[in-house]
Amino acid sequence: MDPSSDYHFLNQILWRRVKLTLVSGIFEGVLQHVDPNKIVVLKNVRNAESGRSVPGVKVFFGHEILNVELMDEAEGASGEKASAVSINTERAGMEKVKNEDVNVCEPASPAPEVPTSSLLSDLKYCPSEEEEVTYTVIDQFQQKFGAAMLHIKKQSVLSVAAEGANVCRHGKLCWLQVATNSRVYLFDIFLLGSRAFNNGLQMILEDKRILKVIHDCRWLSDCLSHQYGIMLNNVFDTQVADVLQFSMETGGFLPNCISTLQESLIRHLKVAPRYLFFLEERQKRIQENPEIWLTRPLPPSLLKILALETTYLLPLRLVLLDEVMSDLTTLVDGYLNTYREGSADRLAGTEPACMELPAELLQLQDFQKQRRERAVKEYRVNARGLLIRTPLHPKEPTACTAGKEERVQGFLFYKTDGGDQVPRFLCPKSHEDEKFLDKESKQTTAKSQIVPPRKEGEAHKDSKNKPGCWESAGPEDPRAQKAHALPPTWASQSQFSLKEEIEQLTVVGNKGALTSPKEGALVSPSLLQETWEAPTDTFHLPEKAEVSTLPPCPALEKTDSWISPSLNLF
């Protein structure tokens, strides 16, 4: 194959289907790229002799090609117009890939070169879809390893990830993924061994001029340090940046937990959960077989997971940087307009050397105060003073499990995996409340008829062993212990229907009993939570509650001594 004559001819038939006759066989595919250095790239490759398709893109070298034939298929012609604009992009992206027998996965429809963040934000993974990420597997030192090192050393920012069997000083590192703006390299450390680090990777990982973007660098840093003597340097950890961003957003509060990569991509990159299926698939595979990354050869589906896992880190870093630096941008904008849009008289009396903190920068105090006030309203605080983050993926509600939603007098109690309750108001209606109370009273009556009377000492023991769907106060809670030790007279009082008691009390109220001056007032969430944790199925309100349009119930007041009198409404 003479480059001087055939190069221009092949460029004229780009995106047409061709047949290449090689020394070792015959291959068919769509001509995607022709390099002056005798490199021909085909996609949708099929071995004409065996009939088997080759996944991704196949690279052929000029000294192997004996003949090139143009195949008359509409497939190539239809793709020519749509992809002609990407010829220069592909040529720049390959960057003279010498001596690389690259077996990679390429986007189905190449597009003009655009900023990496927007290009990567559209990535998605589904086993039934075509590959949408380019990656190169490096499992030998000949040809591919040297070219990869040359490309990586030219970068200023990289994303790095690792997979293996319990990646730490006691585990086994199997794969090291390194992604740039245009390439993703999958280094098979299981096959290459420590020579991979000695021949260039160690220099890159320790280089203080190259920024490495990693999500949770603790495990990889421990593994590299103790097994290979590598001190990881200049790292941007997206997990740490997520906590810093949360602290700034809430005025100084810290979250109760860190975020996984999937949560960070959903929260900051706004990636739809269905496009992050590959992370769920990864977790599923690891649970089924913790040593899945030791498999050789690794299935293409897992190789795609490795590539995608690393590719998303670069745009995630850019978004986190923008969010963390948002206050700086706002304050600088105010600084720019301080004198420019002010009166000229103000400048005459201003000393240039005045070092007093200007009002434009004092706004930062107001920002933090407002954020703290908003955070206290939006989040709940745990015992350590940390804000409890709302799960991004609540599990499907099941009976007697976390994630169950229950409506209680106009409130929606959402129970998280951690056992916390978040009350949310749902605009109560009187007829809905009446139906709810009627339903609860029927359940109470049915239970009281079936359950035989028990001794006083057995109440706490049985309630401890009885499974329940909602949270209990626990044996350490003195309120729960006292509630379980109620006298036996309570059982006889609970025999009455709650609806009948309310109707009787309504009649008494119409004759002169006091009613609440605040009709339609809302019940305090803390009060409802205390009432919800009662061991019985009947709701009670303390005497100070000014929320019900019904008069107080004398029969219920006698047994409300266990409710803390300090509970007040708004």
From Swiss-Prot:
Region described as Disordered: 433-485
Keywords: Cytoplasm, Meiosis, RNA-binding, RNA-mediated gene silencing
KO phenotype (gene knockout): Mice are viable and display normal fertility but show defective biogenesis of antisense piRNAs and activation of transposons. Reduced sequences generated by Piwil2 slicing, impaired biogenesis of Piwil4 piRNAs and derepressed LINE1 retrotransposons.
Record Gene3D superfamilies: Ribonuclease H-like superfamily/Ribonuclease H
Start-end of Basic and acidic residues biased regions: 433-442, 453-465
GO molecular function term, any single one: RNA binding
UniProt xrefs under CDD domains: Egl_like_exo
Broad class of the protein's primary localization: cytoplasm
InterPro entries registered for this protein in UniProt: 3'-5'_exonuclease_dom, piRNA_biogenesis_EXD1, RNaseH-like_sf, RNaseH_sf
Disulfide bonds: none
3'-5' exonuclease domain mapped to chain residues: 135-307
UniProt key word RNA-binding: yes
GO biological process terms on file: meiotic cell cycle; piRNA processing; regulatory ncRNA-mediated gene silencing
Superkingdom in the source lineage: Eukaryota
Protein location: Cytoplasm
One Gene Ontology cellular component annotation held by this UniProt entry: PET complex
Summary of subunit composition and partner proteins: Homodimer. Component of the PET complex, at least composed of EXD1, PIWIL2, TDRD12 and piRNAs.
Protein family according to the UniProt entry: Belongs to the EXD1 family.
Comment, domains: The 3'-5' exonuclease domain lacks the conserved Asp-Glu-Asp-Asp (DEDD) residues that coordinates divalent ions essential for exonuclease activity.
PANTHER family: PIRNA BIOGENESIS PROTEIN EXD1 (PTHR46628:SF1)
Role this protein plays: RNA-binding component of the PET complex, a multiprotein complex required for the processing of piRNAs during spermatogenesis. The piRNA metabolic process mediates the repression of transposable elements during meiosis by forming complexes composed of piRNAs and Piwi proteins and governs the methylation and subsequent repression of transposable elements, preventing their mobilization, which is essential for the germline integrity. The PET complex is required during the secondary piRNAs metabolic process for the PIWIL2 slicing-triggered loading of PIWIL4 piRNAs.
Full protein name: piRNA biogenesis protein EXD1
